[in-house]
Amino acid sequence: MQAGTVFATPFPRFIIIQMKKLLAVISIVLFAIQLQAQDIVLLNQIKTTNGKIKSFEADLENTLTKPKKTTTQNGTLYFVKPYEFAALFTTGRFMIVNENRIKMDIGLFHGTFKLKDGGMMQSLGNIFLYGFQGRIQDLANDNGYSLKTKTENGFHVITATIIKKRLIGIGYKTVVFKYHTDNFLLSEIVLYDYSGNQDSYVISNVKYDVPINKKTFQF
């Protein structure tokens, strides 16, 4: 052996395996961070775009899909920023939110209710009010939802799943918001309850920033 010769000691196999696992974990974490950053950009763009809208009037189609029955009704949706909206259907059914109260004759809900902090009715009202304004991250923070986003079929699709323990098992477990990819404006809100029912609200022919009679929201 010549003086000064150094022989490399090979890494044990288990160390190599652990290093590969570590690199895989790092790659997953970096990918997740990148996705989270993309989600934040998307949610901010949706909020910025819809937050500029002061009011709108739109055609509304509501489809309630139950395991053995599907019903559809049409009507008109009115919204005035930030806390007033009315869904008025040709069937005579309705849902009206006027700041801290909601009056409903739709589905399983009939009557006038106060929108109490943290209550199920407030959560329901916020789904629509926040959705109209693109405030999906605010909805998640204020009402206890986790969020997932994807883009498909010309829509940015945001799925909000309830994680607030006090509300799990009542109301809606999942809400899906669909915004157009070309302009970030709202197209549809779909609610899923714990009984397997799906309640879809699709808006079309939207007229933005139009004057709306305040009597529309009075009750």
Predicted features and spans:
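Short, Lys/Arg-enriched N-terminal segments with co-localized hydrophobic residues
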Residues: 6-18
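Sec-dependent N-terminal signal peptides
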Residues: 22-33
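Flexible, processing/modification-adjacent segments and terminal tails
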Residues: 39-45, 51-59, 64, 70, ...
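One face of beta-strands
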Residues: 56-62, 73-77, 85-87
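Short hydrophobic/aromatic-rich beta-strand segments that constitute the beta-sheet cores
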Residues: 60, 85-89, 102-106, 160, ...
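An acidic-aromatic
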Residues: 76-127, 199
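Gly/Pro-enriched, hydrophobic low-complexity segments
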Residues: 145-219
